[in-house]
Amino acid sequence: MDLFIESKINSLLQFLFGSRQDFLRNFKTWSNNNNNLSIYLLIFGIVVFFYKKPDHLNYIVESVSEMTTNFRNNNSLSRWLPRSKFTHLDEEILKRGGFIAGLVNDGNTCFMNSVLQSLASSRELMEFLDNNVIRTYEEIEQNEHNEEGNGQESAQDEATHKKNTRKGGKVYGKHKKKLNRKSSSKEDEEKSQEPDITFSVALRDLLSALNAKYYRDKPYFKTNSLLKAMSKSPRKNILLGYDQEDAQEFFQNILAELESNVKSLNTEKLDTTPVAKSELPDDALVGQLNLGEVGTVYIPTEQIDPNSILHDKSIQNFTPFKLMTPLDGITAERIGCLQCGENGGIRYSVFSGLSLNLPNENIGSTLKLSQLLSDWSKPEIIEGVECNRCALTAAHSHLFGQLKEFEKKPEGSIPEKLINAVKDRVHQIEEVLAKPVIDDEDYKKLHTANMVRKCSKSKQILISRPPPLLSIHINRSVFDPRTYMIRKNNSKVLFKSRLNLAPWCCDINEINLDARLPMSKKEKAAQQDSSEDENIGGEYYTKLHERFEQEFEDSEEEKEYDDAEGNYASHYNHTKDISNYDPLNGEVDGVTSDDEDEYIEETDALGNTIKKRIIEHSDVENENVKDNEELQEIDNVSLDEPKINVEDQLETSSDEEDVIPAPPINYARSFSTVPATPLTYSLRSVIVHYGTHNYGHYIAFRKYRGCWWRISDETVYVVDEAEVLSTPGVFMLFYEYDFDEETGKMKDDLEAIQSNNEEDDEKEQEQKGVQEPKESQEQGEGEEQEEGQEQMKFERTEDHRDISGKDVN
């Protein structure tokens, strides 16, 4: 960074003063003009000041960035201002707390902001940071505070040791370097052993600030404190801002930092020694029990190592697996022979999210999330693989057949020593074949080189224990064979507000160890695709997302792809198009009569009538023209319009005849038709990428306080769920465990029921409050009428009296 600043200063001095010789040569001339000299000296002083004080320059750059950010937020021409119908928050939203906060785009930081906003919607993550990280750290600090006496004694011993290693109060030469290395390594070791939750605290504080209730205010915060707490933060350029990175990469960095903090709280390494079932803790997490909790999960050891039951079949052991964060789960992978069914044991491993690849064929087509999950978990066939059991079985059959042949021959013709050796080998193979799994060591000892059997194996992976917060990454990078470049696959992925993971999950007691059978013993759950098949949002949201996509089109990349595609299409059309084909070589160009048309039919050199060919071509041409006109009309509406702000387009398009009215936002808490099960997860947030592979913008949709928010850096506003589910360019999805074990319902549904009941109570109170003033008003009006009648009677009696008060009559 210092070299970069120095180069900029030298360039500036070169521009202002020329070379140093020119500056000295013209110094006397400049001194005659005091004004110019003062200006140059002032500029030179400012440059030197910023060179000596780079922090002040950073502060000014950040201040200017903040000023431009404020202008961008407050300016009506902002690119991502909310639409006019969203500027007014419903009273129901205000009752729930109003606006949530945004995040400042500090130069290409939309990928960070979208990930942080998505994580802020997770209840499981917030509870984990409060209870499992910060509270544990406070307990450790309290225990260390109670043991301060021992710490002071150890510090005195260390000081005495340092004093004894010095010579005359100083250390020289190689001995000094050796001590420095020892002290630095010791300090690093102590730092690594000390609990450090700096990042976790910064993350919790930032997420809490985002989730606070701001009502009608629209605040936004910076991510500087969080990035400073990261050991590997994204690279930043002082002028250009942060390097554009992938949201998935930043998400992985967040997980790495969080895991590092959790490990610092417990420096003891996880003991993977199997534990007997009788010695398991009372609250042990076995299989899929208590999916919302994070901790040590126990898996049956006999599934991992089937030969473990040979020691003692009466004792069932469990192997521990440590889940560090709420985003950690466990997958089960089975690789087995399709001929004998043997597998080397189920491979359980901890994962922190799923990455689903889009198919390379039919780029741009519409896909389903359930389809991508099924492709991820479908069995993979591996051909030409050695199988230990099949090879030893073949060797056993061969040797056993030899023994049968030996028995048929006369006694003494075969050496007894050879017969005994074959019998011993057969017996050894039979003992090994009796094991559940044949180890590689036994296979190497007993197999015969010419008895190797190649077979086919199946490889399949399922989710054994889903994490409390499941992250799904849609990998949209695809290799384009036409341009030999990596480009973005813009296929639309349909997803639901709730996801039943049952078809892709398998508990520990539901796994088939025989590879010839389906991996899961349970019947394949019916995938509920009803909501995915619907065109959610309709035409309005389709055009809306097209406008957002057009905002971040990379013209150069699209042009290269279009040129390559156009060349391919033109070559294809050139070889297939017969519209200019003339079998008569222009001999009948001037013929137009009906008789001459018949002549064309009769003289076709290819055996086809010219008239028929012309009619078919004209029909096709007319159909193409008609289709092109229809496409042109669609393009005129959706694609050929100038790229202007979406909000301005929606406002100005109100005068057009074919304007599509925006659907109203449903602020009420909705209920899903997906059944409530422990494996039913609720959608919490969605990260969307607009643009191409090399250029674009990340935004986030996240559900909080019962409604969906669209967040583009500093800009935050409410949207309908239909807009979220109709998003075509989904990049990441976050589904959260939402099942309430006590009631057997989803927590979102319970909150919706409670909210609806509160609204009904408020309406009843309002109605009662309206009726009571009406009754009191009617009662008051009756009293006023009675007083008026009495007053009239009094006035009438007064009219019949004279001044003296006597009755005139």
Swiss-Prot record:
Pfam families reported for this sequence: UCH (PF00443)
Region (Disordered): 143-195, 569-596, 750-809
The EC number(s) this enzyme carries: 3.4.19.12
Reaction it catalyzes: Thiol-dependent hydrolysis of ester, thioester, amide, peptide and isopeptide bonds formed by the C-terminal Gly of ubiquitin (a 76-residue protein attached to proteins as an intracellular targeting signal)
Modified-residue entries (Phosphoserine), positions: 530-531, 555, 618, 638, 653-654, 670, 755
Gene3D superfamilies in UniProt: Cysteine proteinases
Residues passing through the membrane, by range: none
Keyword Cell cycle: no
Acidic residues bias: start-end ranges: 778-789
Active site: 110 (nucleophile), 697 (proton acceptor)
Compositional bias segments (type: Basic residues): 162-183
Compositionally biased residues, Basic and acidic residues: 184-194, 765-777, 790-809
Domain USP residues, every copy: 101-738
Top EC category: hydrolase
Cited InterPro entries: Papain-like_cys_pep_sf, Peptidase_C19, Peptidase_C19_UCH, USP_CS, USP_dom
Keywords: Hydrolase, Phosphoprotein, Protease, Thiol protease, Ubl conjugation pathway
Domain of life from the UniProt record: Eukaryota
Remarks, miscellaneous: Present with 8970 molecules/cell in log phase SD medium.
Function: Has an ATP-independent isopeptidase activity, cleaving at the C-terminus of the ubiquitin moiety in natural or engineered linear fusion proteins, irrespective of their size or the presence of an N-terminal extension to ubiquitin.
PANTHER family: UBIQUITIN CARBOXYL-TERMINAL HYDROLASE (PTHR24006), UBIQUITIN CARBOXYL-TERMINAL HYDROLASE 30 (PTHR24006:SF888)
Descriptive protein name: Ubiquitin carboxyl-terminal hydrolase 1
